[in-house]
Amino acid sequence: MGSFEEAFKFPIVAWNKVCWPVEVGGLGIRRIGLFNQALLGKWLWRFGCETNRLWCQVIASKYGETSGGWCTRVGRGSQGCGMWKNIRKGAKSFFGHVLYVVGEGLHIRLWYDLWSGHIPLKDLYPDLFSHALGKDVWISELITITSDGGSRSWNIQFHQAPDDWEVERVDAFYEHIYSKMRRGVGVDSLFWKLTLNGVFDVRSFYNSLSAPPTISFPWKCIWSSKVPKRVSFFLWTAAQDSILTIDNLVKRNLHLVNSCCLCRCDGETVDHLLLYCKFANAL
């Protein structure tokens, strides 16, 4: 990213900033490791959505299933060799962006899984969870579906009947879970939180992994101007305060006299050289 002399090159901008999206001040260069992880996330999504496909059944048979069948167990020893081992490594970050949509409820746990919102019910209603019978139960064990599939009823049991002061809390709990159940009968499915339509895409997963800052940057003024790209690049480095002025060279431990090479009136910073120097003002 620039050079001071042919024998030695200074890194002008930190690589993590270069990899930020253009909109927040980077160059939009993808980090290969994170992009590869995002690509592998597509296979985790397919494994959860294509359970009847032969390849899913083979993988599940080899490694075993966990989390209601949405993912496999971690392979160990020689069992963990191969491509799936690397795919499985990204499961924790992947499932952090997944909600579960209840169909029959065979693969979704009432209290632990994210199906009724972004907080599991055990954390949203800790008082009721502490009194619940069978804390690790599947939703299918607690609902009764009418023959036409039009409505469902819950049968959640607690250690004791709620006290008078708890009745309102229990009513709010039931109102909450009823509101999150879709009508009709279907299979349990995944919903990707990072897209509006709930379908996984690589770009949204990559952006979550790279976690760029939410800052304002005049990227349109820099990259949309009708000037040569080298001029745009110079403006970008100036906006990053990364031009190799004497002030920045001193920060890189070079022993120089920090004085403007044009006016000799102040230190040669980016702001002084381009904005406040009397020679710059004359331009």
Q: What is each of the regions a protein language model found here?
A:
Residues 1-283:
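A helix-boundary/hinge signal
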